[in-house]
Design a protein with these regions (language model features):
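"Short basic amphipathic alpha-helical interaction patches in structured regions
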Residues: 98-107, 143-146, 204
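A short, flexible beta-alpha/helix-coil linker loop
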Residues: 94, 135, 223-226
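Active-site glycine/GP-rich loop and adjacent strand/helix microenvironment
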Residues: 1-14, 18-33, 140-141, 150-359
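Helix N-cap/coil-helix junction residues
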Residues: 50, 122-123, 209, 247
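Internal, well-ordered alpha/beta segment that forms a basic, Gly-enriched binding/recognition surface
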Residues: 92, 109-166
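Active-site diphosphate/adenylate-binding microenvironment
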Residues: 17, 21, 36-87, 95-102, ...
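Ser/Thr-glycine-rich phosphate-binding loops at phosphate-binding pockets of nucleotides
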Residues: 85-95, 193, 256-259
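Short, conserved beta-strand segments within well-ordered enzyme catalytic domains
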Residues: 87, 129, 188-190
């Protein structure tokens, strides 16, 4: 089955039992592919004695700690085929992950993102406010996770404006004009959680001005660590934004540069959902066995997308719990889950959190 054929499947209407069969087959195909094209990956699997006979289910596929992409060059393409290099967010002194993409994988990332996000926003492109500054996307050959997020989500915008200038100052006059020009239309806002709080919400609150974004949709992600430290819960975040601009349709997402494209969107009930093209496995920290619904553990993310690098099964540094399977009240099939935050002593990784650490 080609990835184009997989993308033709509905992002949220494949029941988990059927999806398990697809995942097991395609993850094993990717494992064989990367063993044949990435010597370091093959050596790791040889070292643990992995054989195909052991892999009956998705959870049987060996995972790589996501941190390995900071320490090693892991790619399954020759250097001449590198189309784009993605880098993770990182504070000063931290190593960053480098993810090597060929043209096909980069294209699949964008197509996958469109399939997932369009389920939430609709298929029409919308007037769009990017809550960031223009300079973040200037170097398109060496993208940070922040720049990739901005550029990736920009595809959903018909007319776009940046809410901040390069000094990270809110452009209130431009915002007023943009909102007035699109009065009565649905507007899409996108940004990273801490930057929205620091440079959009706080600036609006200080100005005492209330913008009318009551028909808008806000998508945000990138880490909650700094806001948690400031005792701002997701509920308080949503409530505060509604107070200053009337927005009530707010959706968080969970994702990482190591699996760009396969993000997990928050539904109307406040649950993070994995799509048909990826999955989440919760593992116990003691022995990495699979935890049942409701039990906290370390999140593993799997994706059918990565062809140019061995990132199809990754153990994250995040703690979470599975909330249910195929039975979310929103009607979407598959697993839905909650993220509690970083494992203690893990590095800052999210775009929001690493940006917050620099200011």
């Amino acid at each position: 089955m080609t990835y184009e054929e997989i993308l033709a499947l509905s992002p949220y209407q494949v029941p988990q039992m059927k999806k398990q069969v697809l995942l097991a087959r395609e993850l094993m195909r990717l494992t064989r592919h990367h063993r044949g094209h990435c010597q370091a990956y093959d050596r790791m699997l040889t070292a643990i004695g992995f054989t195909e006979r052991e892999a009956e289910n998705p959870e049987d596929i060996p995972f790589l700690p996501v941190r390995l992409f900071k320490e090693m060059e892991l790619r399954s393409i020759p250097s001449k085929d590198i189309f784009k290099t993605m880098t993770s967010s990182g504070t000063s002194g931290q190593n960053v992950s480098k993810i090597y993409l060929d043209r096909a994988t980069a294209s699949y990332q964008q197509k996958t993102l469109v399939r997932i996000v369009s389920d939430m926003t609709g298929s029409a492109r919308l007037p769009m406010i990017l809550i960031d500054c223009p300079s973040v996307v200037q170097n398109r050959a060496m993208f940070s996770a922040r720049g990739a997020g901005i550029l990736g989500f920009s595809i959903f915008g018909r007319k776009k404006m940046y809410a901040l200038n390069d000094n990270m100052e809110l452009q209130l006059d431009s915002l007023r004009e943009f909102i007035a020009a699109h009065r009565g239309e649905k507007i899409l806002l996108f940004g990273f959680t801490f930057m929205i709080w620091q440079h959009f919400y706080r600036a609006l609150a200080a100005s005492k001005e209330k913008l009318d974004l009551s028909t808008a949709v806000l998508i945000h992600g990138g880490g909650w660590k700094r806001l948690t430290q400031e005792a701002v819960s997701p509920e308080q975040f949503n409530s505060a934004l509604k107070e200053v601009c009337g927005i009530s349709h707010i959706s968080n997402y969970y994702g990482m540069v190591e699996q760009t494209g396969c993000i997990c969107m928050e539904c109307e009930k406040g649950h993070l959902h994995v799509s048909t093209y990826s999955d989440v496995i919760v593992r116990r920290g003691l022995d990495f066995s699979v935890a049942p619904v409701g039990e906290k553990g370390i999140l593993e993310v799997v994706s059918l997308l990565p062809e140019s690098y061995p990132g199809h099964a990754l153990l994250t540094e995040d703690e979470g719990a599975l909330l249910g399977v195929d039975d979310c009240p929103c009607g979407r099939k598959g697993k839905y889950f909650k993220v509690f935050g970083r494992i203690q002593h893990a590095e800052l990784r999210g775009c929001s959190d690493t940006y917050a650490a620099k200011i």
